[in-house]
Amino acid sequence: MNKDAYIQMFKDTNALLEGHFLLSSGKHSAKYLQCAKVLQYPNLAEMICSDLAQHFKDQQIDVVIGPALGAVTLSYELARQLNCRSIFAEREDGIMKLRRGFKIEEGEKVLVVEDVITTGGSVREIIEIVKEYRGEVVAVAGIVDRSGGKVDLGYPLKTLLTLEIETFEPEECPLCREGIPIVKPGSRKK
Protein backbone atom coordinates (compact mmCIF):
# COMPACT_ATOMS: atom_id res chain seq x y z
CA MET A 1 0.00 0.00 0.00
CA ASN A 2 1.13 3.56 -0.55
CA LYS A 3 1.19 6.51 1.83
CA ASP A 4 -2.17 7.87 0.67
CA ALA A 5 -3.84 4.48 1.21
CA TYR A 6 -2.50 4.32 4.77
CA ILE A 7 -3.67 7.86 5.51
CA GLN A 8 -7.10 6.93 4.14
CA MET A 9 -7.11 3.83 6.39
CA PHE A 10 -6.52 6.09 9.41
CA LYS A 11 -9.34 8.40 8.31
CA ASP A 12 -11.75 5.53 7.61
CA THR A 13 -11.22 4.09 11.10
CA ASN A 14 -11.39 7.50 12.82
CA ALA A 15 -7.79 7.00 13.97
CA LEU A 16 -6.59 10.45 12.86
CA LEU A 17 -7.79 12.77 15.60
CA GLU A 18 -7.73 16.57 15.66
CA GLY A 19 -7.82 18.75 18.77
CA HIS A 20 -5.27 19.48 21.53
CA PHE A 21 -3.30 16.46 22.69
CA LEU A 22 -0.68 15.70 25.31
CA LEU A 23 1.66 13.15 23.76
CA SER A 24 3.61 10.47 25.64
CA SER A 25 6.74 12.55 24.97
CA GLY A 26 5.26 15.42 27.01
CA LYS A 27 4.87 17.56 23.89
CA HIS A 28 1.56 18.97 22.66
CA SER A 29 0.03 18.53 19.20
CA ALA A 30 -3.11 19.43 17.24
CA LYS A 31 -3.18 15.94 15.69
CA TYR A 32 -3.05 12.48 17.23
CA LEU A 33 -2.79 9.09 15.55
CA GLN A 34 -4.65 6.43 17.54
CA CYS A 35 -3.29 3.25 15.95
CA ALA A 36 -5.43 1.08 18.23
CA LYS A 37 -8.46 2.23 16.21
CA VAL A 38 -6.85 0.72 13.10
CA LEU A 39 -5.38 -2.36 14.77
CA GLN A 40 -8.74 -3.33 16.32
CA TYR A 41 -9.55 -4.79 12.90
CA PRO A 42 -7.58 -8.04 12.45
CA ASN A 43 -7.62 -7.76 8.66
CA LEU A 44 -6.04 -4.29 8.81
CA ALA A 45 -3.49 -5.39 11.43
CA GLU A 46 -2.57 -8.31 9.18
CA MET A 47 -2.20 -6.02 6.15
CA ILE A 48 -0.07 -3.46 8.03
CA CYS A 49 2.20 -6.12 9.52
CA SER A 50 2.50 -7.94 6.21
CA ASP A 51 3.87 -4.76 4.65
CA LEU A 52 6.30 -4.28 7.55
CA ALA A 53 7.33 -7.96 7.62
CA GLN A 54 8.50 -7.78 4.01
CA HIS A 55 11.43 -5.62 5.17
CA PHE A 56 12.62 -8.14 7.78
CA LYS A 57 11.73 -11.59 6.40
CA ASP A 58 15.34 -12.43 5.50
CA GLN A 59 16.89 -11.26 8.78
CA GLN A 60 16.12 -14.32 10.96
CA ILE A 61 14.43 -12.29 13.70
CA ASP A 62 14.11 -14.29 16.95
CA VAL A 63 11.98 -11.85 18.97
CA VAL A 64 9.74 -8.86 18.29
CA ILE A 65 9.35 -6.53 21.28
CA GLY A 66 7.40 -3.34 21.83
CA PRO A 67 6.12 -1.24 24.72
CA ALA A 68 2.73 -1.95 26.27
CA LEU A 69 0.13 -0.93 25.56
CA GLY A 70 0.36 0.62 22.12
CA ALA A 71 2.67 -1.89 20.46
CA VAL A 72 1.32 -5.18 21.87
CA THR A 73 -0.94 -5.98 18.90
CA LEU A 74 1.67 -4.74 16.42
CA SER A 75 4.39 -6.87 18.04
CA TYR A 76 2.19 -9.96 18.12
CA GLU A 77 1.00 -9.80 14.51
CA LEU A 78 4.44 -8.91 13.15
CA ALA A 79 6.00 -11.81 15.09
CA ARG A 80 3.28 -14.14 13.79
CA GLN A 81 4.17 -13.19 10.24
CA LEU A 82 7.92 -13.50 10.90
CA ASN A 83 7.36 -16.84 12.68
CA CYS A 84 9.09 -15.80 15.90
CA ARG A 85 8.29 -14.86 19.51
CA SER A 86 6.48 -11.70 20.54
CA ILE A 87 7.05 -10.07 23.92
CA PHE A 88 6.36 -6.67 25.39
CA ALA A 89 7.82 -4.42 28.04
CA GLU A 90 5.70 -2.47 30.46
CA ARG A 91 6.16 0.21 33.06
CA GLU A 92 6.56 -0.65 36.70
CA ASP A 93 6.98 2.37 38.97
CA GLY A 94 7.63 4.46 35.86
CA ILE A 95 10.43 2.24 34.57
CA MET A 96 10.09 0.17 31.40
CA LYS A 97 10.98 -3.48 32.05
CA LEU A 98 10.26 -7.05 31.08
CA ARG A 99 7.71 -8.76 33.31
CA ARG A 100 5.46 -11.83 33.12
CA GLY A 101 8.46 -14.13 32.74
CA PHE A 102 9.54 -12.59 29.43
CA LYS A 103 13.25 -12.58 28.65
CA ILE A 104 15.64 -12.18 25.77
CA GLU A 105 18.43 -14.72 25.40
CA GLU A 106 21.97 -13.53 24.76
CA GLY A 107 22.58 -13.11 21.03
CA GLU A 108 18.93 -13.27 19.98
CA LYS A 109 18.11 -11.03 17.02
CA VAL A 110 15.49 -8.54 18.12
CA LEU A 111 13.14 -6.29 16.17
CA VAL A 112 11.90 -3.35 18.28
CA VAL A 113 8.44 -2.03 17.35
CA GLU A 114 6.28 0.94 18.27
CA ASP A 115 3.00 2.03 16.74
CA VAL A 116 3.78 5.78 16.52
CA ILE A 117 7.26 7.26 16.92
CA THR A 118 7.52 10.95 17.82
CA THR A 119 10.71 11.48 19.84
CA GLY A 120 11.65 7.81 20.14
CA GLY A 121 11.69 7.88 23.94
CA SER A 122 9.85 4.59 24.48
CA VAL A 123 11.84 2.91 21.70
CA ARG A 124 15.12 3.96 23.33
CA GLU A 125 13.93 2.44 26.62
CA ILE A 126 13.16 -0.84 24.84
CA ILE A 127 16.56 -0.79 23.10
CA GLU A 128 18.23 -0.44 26.52
CA ILE A 129 16.31 -3.47 27.79
CA VAL A 130 17.47 -5.52 24.79
CA LYS A 131 21.07 -4.46 25.46
CA GLU A 132 20.76 -5.37 29.16
CA TYR A 133 19.79 -8.89 28.12
CA ARG A 134 22.62 -8.93 25.55
CA GLY A 135 20.24 -9.29 22.63
CA GLU A 136 21.08 -7.87 19.22
CA VAL A 137 18.83 -5.06 18.00
CA VAL A 138 18.44 -5.58 14.25
CA ALA A 139 16.15 -2.64 13.50
CA VAL A 140 13.19 -0.59 14.67
CA ALA A 141 9.81 -0.79 12.94
CA GLY A 142 6.62 1.20 13.32
CA ILE A 143 3.45 2.22 11.62
CA VAL A 144 4.04 5.98 11.77
CA ASP A 145 7.11 8.17 12.18
CA ARG A 146 5.53 11.51 13.04
CA SER A 147 8.92 13.24 13.38
CA GLY A 148 9.16 13.65 9.61
CA GLY A 149 12.21 11.37 9.55
CA LYS A 150 14.15 13.47 12.07
CA VAL A 151 14.33 10.93 14.91
CA ASP A 152 17.64 9.03 15.10
CA LEU A 153 17.46 5.82 17.13
CA GLY A 154 20.91 4.51 16.24
CA TYR A 155 19.42 1.59 14.30
CA PRO A 156 17.69 1.28 10.92
CA LEU A 157 14.09 2.54 11.17
CA LYS A 158 11.32 1.31 8.89
CA THR A 159 7.84 2.82 9.12
CA LEU A 160 4.92 2.68 6.72
CA LEU A 161 4.17 6.38 7.07
CA THR A 162 6.55 9.27 7.65
CA LEU A 163 4.62 12.41 8.52
CA GLU A 164 5.71 15.78 9.75
CA ILE A 165 3.11 16.62 12.37
CA GLU A 166 3.95 19.72 14.33
CA THR A 167 4.52 19.32 18.05
CA PHE A 168 5.00 22.00 20.70
CA GLU A 169 6.77 22.28 24.02
CA PRO A 170 4.04 22.95 26.62
CA GLU A 171 5.30 26.46 27.36
CA GLU A 172 5.23 27.35 23.63
CA CYS A 173 1.93 25.69 22.71
CA PRO A 174 -0.45 27.97 20.76
CA LEU A 175 -3.36 25.64 21.62
CA CYS A 176 -2.74 26.24 25.34
CA ARG A 177 -2.62 30.00 24.72
CA GLU A 178 -5.99 29.74 22.95
CA GLY A 179 -7.41 27.94 25.99
CA ILE A 180 -8.27 24.77 24.08
CA PRO A 181 -8.70 21.92 26.59
CA ILE A 182 -5.98 19.27 26.39
CA VAL A 183 -6.64 15.54 26.08
CA LYS A 184 -4.20 12.71 26.90
CA PRO A 185 -5.31 9.84 24.65
CA GLY A 186 -2.27 7.51 24.96
CA SER A 187 -1.56 4.75 27.43
CA ARG A 188 1.43 6.15 29.32
CA LYS A 189 0.73 7.83 32.64
CA LYS A 190 3.12 10.69 33.38
Curated annotation (Swiss-Prot):
Pfam families: Pribosyltran (PF00156). The gene is pyrE. Orotate binds at T118, R146. 5-phospho-alpha-D-ribose 1-diphosphate binds at E114, D115, V116, I117, T118, T119, G120, G121, S122. Catalyzes the transfer of a ribosyl phosphate group from 5-phosphoribose 1-diphosphate to orotate, leading to the formation of orotidine monophosphate (OMP). Pathway: Pyrimidine metabolism; UMP biosynthesis via de novo pathway; UMP from orotate: step 1/2. This is Orotate phosphoribosyltransferase. Its EC number is 2.4.2.10. Homodimer.
